[in-house]
Amino acid sequence: MLGNCIENVRKNVPLVHNITNYVTVNDVANVLLACGGSPIMSDEPEDVKEITSICGGLNINIGTLNKRSIEGMFAAGARANELGHATLLDPVGAGASTLRTNTAVELMEKIRFDVIRGNISEVKTLEQGSGTTKGVDADVADAVTEENLEEGIAFAKAFAKKAGCIVAITGAIDLVSDADRCYVIRNGRPEMGKITGTGCQLSGMMTAFLTANPEQKLEAAAAAVCTMGLAGEIGWSYMQKGDGNATYRNRIIDAIYNMDKETLDKGAKYEIR
């Protein structure tokens, strides 16, 4: 069951190196702490190799990339690969600009990732080399729905096979897939879209899950997605009149902090296709 994955995170307290964006860095750190991991943030090229060396996982997020941080991403990624660390790419906004798209594609080519996690438009951009990403949000025309679910599953499996890694496509319906099996996940609340950075937070947390569960990476990635979605549901249940998205953000982090094996196993909504 997926609950074992979060239990392993809490037992092992994996240290995760995050090269993440400046908009959400504090929340990424807090979510990593809440799930049982330990965060460290560094994107300075002269620093990242040593930082990655003392960690167990690497989370690369291109949300606020610049020339210096891009250099740091490649240096950290190469070192993580040398050490066999869990690695994740979050190609935020790929398809919205040439720099983002080219950087994400080159990272895929030069670094071995265990998971690529993004919205459907970002992942399609990596597949096609260009896309229709609207800022950092998925294009509505690309969204995975009940009507096109079979097509989405087939795309996820094909992309995972081509990329040689797990893909986690998040949205109203989440798909977490390798070349053979796809977790279709239906946890979450639409109101989570009113909080900036829930995807970035998930990427940090997912890296901790991968690091603590090296023998079951597909299940670990799915467990992280279910944890975030279920936390959104639990957090929303505590909202009161007058509460807004700032309160909701904190409720989600609190729900992750209090998540345990039993709660996750009971509340996770998924099927394997």
Residue ranges of each PLM-predicted region?
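Short, small-residue alpha-helix embedded
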Residues: 194-226
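Charged C-terminal helix
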Residues: 230-273
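Conserved N-terminal subdomain of the carbohydrate kinase-like
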Residues: 2-89
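Short, well-structured alpha-helical segments that form the helix of a local strand-helix-strand
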Residues: 155-156, 160, 216-232, 252-253
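Glycine/small-residue-rich loop that forms an oxyanion/phosphate-binding "nest" at active or ligand-binding sites
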Residues: 69-118
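Conserved phosphate/ATP/ADP-binding segment of small-molecule kinases
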Residues: 101-182
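Short pre-catalytic strand/loop immediately N-terminal to key active-site residues, enriched for Gly-Thr
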Residues: 185-196
